[in-house]
C-alpha cells in the first residue's frame, strides 16, 4: 500500500505477537541454532544467542516503532529517507535477499518431508516445493488477514514440533545435551552472535511491513523485540 495503515485496520497485541512469531519461526534460523550447537560449548552457545538475539531484537524493535508510528511500509520509509530514486537500492537488496530466503525456506520444508513420506519418489520434492510456495505467496497476496490465520495455525504447531524434537533428542541421544556441549569446536562467541544476527537481519529490516498494523507503538516494539529475541 502507498498509504499509511488506517486506525480501523490495526491489530491487537496478541494478533501482532502471533504474526511476528510466525515471521521469525523460520527454518534457516533453526539451522543456525544447529550450527551453533555444533561449534560452541554450552556457555558460548548461550552467550552467542543472548548477544545476537539482543542486538537483533533492539534493531528490529526500533524499526517496528517507526513502522507503527508512521503506518508506512519499509519501502515508503526508504523513500522518506533516501528519496524516490535513492530508495531503489535498499528496496532491491531486501527484495533480492527475501526471494533467496523464500527458496531456502520452501526447500528446507520440502526435502525432509519428502524423505519422510515418500523417500523413493523424487517427484514429491518439486511438488512440495510448489505447494509450499503457493501457500506462502498466497498468504502474502491476501494480506494481513491471511497472515493472521496462518500464524495462529503454524506458531503452535512449530512450537510443539520444536519441544517434541528436543525431548526426542534427549531421550534417544547417547549422551546428555550438557555432555554434547562440553567442548567447543573452535567457533567464537562473536562469530556465533554474527550468525544469529545474519540469519535474520535482512528479514528484520522489513519489520515495518508488519509492525505498521499494530495499534500502538508499544505493542509493536514489545511483540517485535520478544519475537526476534526468541
Spans of model-derived segments:
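Extracellular loop-to-transmembrane helix junctions
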Residues: 35-64, 86-88, 228-229
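Hydrophobic, small-residue-rich membrane helices and short re-entrant helix-turn-helix hairpins
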Residues: 5, 9-13, 142-152, 202-230
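Hydrophobic alpha-helical segments and their helix-loop junctions in multi-pass secondary transporters
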Residues: 140, 156-182, 192, 197-200
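Juxtamembrane interface elements at the cytosolic ends of transmembrane helices
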Residues: 29-33, 71, 175, 197-220
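Juxtamembrane transmembrane-helix boundary signature
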Residues: 49-82, 91-97
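Selective recognition of specific alpha-helical transmembrane segments in multi-pass small-molecule
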Residues: 28, 54-59, 94-103, 157-168, ...
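Membrane-water interface regions at transmembrane-helix termini and the short interhelical loops
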Residues: 34-39, 64-65, 89, 108-119, ...
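Membrane-interface "cap" regions at the ends of multi-pass membrane proteins
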Residues: 1-43, 187-193, 212-222
Amino acid at each position: 500500500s502507498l498509504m499509511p495503515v488506517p486506525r480501523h485496520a490495526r491489530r491487537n497485541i496478541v494478533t501482532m505477537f502471533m504474526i511476528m512469531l510466525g515471521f521469525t519461526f523460520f527454518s534457516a534460523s533453526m539451522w543456525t541454532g544447529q550450527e551453533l550447537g555444533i561449534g560452541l560449548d554450552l556457555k558460548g552457545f548461550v552467550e552467542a544467542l543472548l548477544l545476537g538475539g539482543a542486538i537483533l531484537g533492539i534493531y528490529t524493535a526500533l524499526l517496528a516503532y517507526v513502522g507503527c508510528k508512521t503506518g508506512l511500509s519499509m519501502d515508503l520509509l526508504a523513500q522518506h529517507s533516501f528519496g524516490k530514486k535513492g530508495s531503489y537500492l535498499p528496496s532491491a537488496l531486501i527484495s533480492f535477499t527475501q526471494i533467496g530466503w523464500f527458496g531456502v525456506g520452501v526447500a528446507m520444508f520440502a526435502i525432509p518431508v519428502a524423505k519422510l513420506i515418500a523417500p523413493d519418489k523424487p517427484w514429491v520434492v518439486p511438488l512440495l516445493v510448489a505447494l509450499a510456495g503457493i501457500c506462502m505467496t498466497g498468504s502474502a497476496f491476501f494480506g494481513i488477514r491471511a497472515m493472521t490465520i496462518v500464524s495462529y495455525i503454524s506458531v503452535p504447531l512449530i512450537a510443539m514440533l520444536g519441544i517434541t524434537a528436543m525431548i526426542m533428542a534427549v531421550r534417544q541421544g547417547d549422551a546428555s545435551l550438557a555432555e554434547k556441549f562440553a567442548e567447543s569446536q573452535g567457533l567464537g562467541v562473536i562469530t556465533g552472535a554474527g550468525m544469529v544476527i545474519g540469519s535474520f537481519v535482512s528479514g528484520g529490516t522489513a519489520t515495518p511491513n508488519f509492525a505498521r498494523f499494530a495499534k500502538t507503538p508499544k505493542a509493536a516494539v514489545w511483540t517485535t523485540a520478544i519475537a526476534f529475541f526468541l
